[in-house]
Amino acid sequence: MEEKQIDYTAIKDIPASAWEKLSQKKIYFGHQSVGFNIIDGVNDIIKENPAIKLNIVETSSPSDFNKGVFAHSRVGENVDPESKTDAFIKIINKLEHHIDIAFFKFCYVDINSQTDVNKVFNHYKETMAKLKNKYPKTKFVHFTIPLGTTKITLKTRIKMLIGKKDIWELDANIRKNEYNELL
């Protein structure tokens, strides 16, 4: 059976029945430092919208997945994206069939100008394919890598104006965007 896609333009447009259905899901979110900011943002949205009743818990313990939960925990180490992918698969294998939705995010510091983007992406892609095959009832969600801010100095502006292609100040974001395009 094909899932029906519904698009809402604002949180207030989402009916209470949809929030109730979501609250019954077993969700896992793997992250590092910035993920806590995302969880803070979700909690802020919940405070402003009483119909949202997500049970947000910092855990990756299978015993916490016997009812609806939005669980989250740290995965891997910052600046080592493959460690995050490897930690995520270990957690999902530990949780087995206890989850409905699972995802993790890389941090903006995980990709820099020296990163082999194809290697990182291929490791991620292979890992996610294994998980999808092993846990076909779990919906895996994919996230792009956030871009960082770059201080545009006079020197950087001049490089841009003269059409210089290799501007190291922008290289990290270029690599992140390359990854995002692969995704």
Task: Please report, for each region that a protein language model flagged, where it lies by residue.
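Soluble non-cytosolic domains of exported or imported proteins
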Residues: 32-36, 82, 114-122, 170-177
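N-terminal module-boundary/linker segments of secreted carbohydrate-active enzymes
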Residues: 1-52
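Alpha-helical scaffolding within the catalytic cores
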Residues: 10-14, 82-93, 125-127, 146
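Loop/turn elements at helix/coil->beta-strand transitions in domains of secreted/extracellular proteins
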Residues: 23-26, 50-55, 97-102, 133-141
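Conserved SGNH/GDSL esterase-like catalytic core that processes O-acyl groups on lipids
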Residues: 34-115
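Generic structural signal for well-ordered alpha-helices
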Residues: 124-129, 180-183
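Substrate-gating cap/lid alpha-helix
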Residues: 150-183
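A structural motif
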Residues: 95-100, 135-162
